[in-house]
Amino acid sequence: MQPATIVLLLALLLGIQPITTDLYLPALPALSQALGASMAQSQLTLSALLLAFGCAQLVLGPLSDRFGRKPILLWGLAAYVLAAVAGVMAPSIELLIVARTVQGAAMGAAVMCARAVVRDLYAPAAGARVMSRALSGLGVIACLSAPVGGLASDLFGWRAALLLPAVFGAVTLALVVWRFVESVPHKNPRALHPGTLLRTWGVILRNPTFVAFCALTCASYGLLFTFLAASSFVFIQVLGLSKTQYGLVMFWNSLWYVAGTFLCRYWLQRHGVRGTVARAGVLALAGATTMGVLALAGVVSVWAIALPLVPIMLAHGIN
């Protein structure tokens, strides 16, 4: 595969995450009203998706080691498109939650394989450079997801925001069929043996570096997705923004995420990995604390939320 093709594929495969989680958020209040669902039920369309996304990778990783990246990508993206279409057609919140759960598991195939492909094809230093270029593409997709979703919802209704990920998945699937060349040099026939799986997981869980960075990642994503799950209801129903205006607020957040990825490269050269991660932790803690203090003080406005999110999103981009 040509380097440009690899970067494009990686950007699309990684970008499927914000397409799936961010693009439909402006439509969440309208979706709830149309399906007669409570806010908690509607939020399950995100939390169930994320749970399936995380758990599926525990199985999809060994499957891709055994059978190769391309079969997992093909089956995963096909399932993603079908689940997205099922979500568009769902007549009830319960069926939508089921469709989104399948969509989350399928999304895991795309994101997991994208990172595995980098490891297959590149040495660590070269892989980091390729991944940084792909993450720039991811940043652009993340910036556009919520504004496009808000505009589509305002113009065509909430189901349009669920249809667009199906289109994105279909385009990505076509590119994988057309351009992707299997990246695993030697498939591992023992990858799915229970003993192999247990030994591998044991080695990983006993690694203190993994545990530390896993905790960091959980905190960073936990903070982000807790905000995402409630943000559309707060900004649209409480603060009175339109779907398009809400999308622009999310665009603001994504810009700071992209800025964080650039700041990360600069800080890595000056402070190393540990110093960079420590500084990102301080930023996230400062932003979250400020937001909490303002909320407890009764300050309710768009900027009381958007401004404290700046250091939080910077930190997320760094992490």
Where are these regions (language model features)?
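Helix-breaking motifs and short loop linkers at transmembrane-helix boundaries and internal kinks
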Residues: A34-G36, G68, M89-L95, A106, ...
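Conserved MFS/SLC helix-loop-helix module at the cytosolic interface between two early adjacent transmembrane helices
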Residues: C55-E94
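Structural signature of the two symmetry-related core transmembrane helices
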Residues: P71-V85, G275-M291
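C-terminal transmembrane helical hairpin of 12-TM major facilitator-type secondary transporters
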Residues: V277-N319
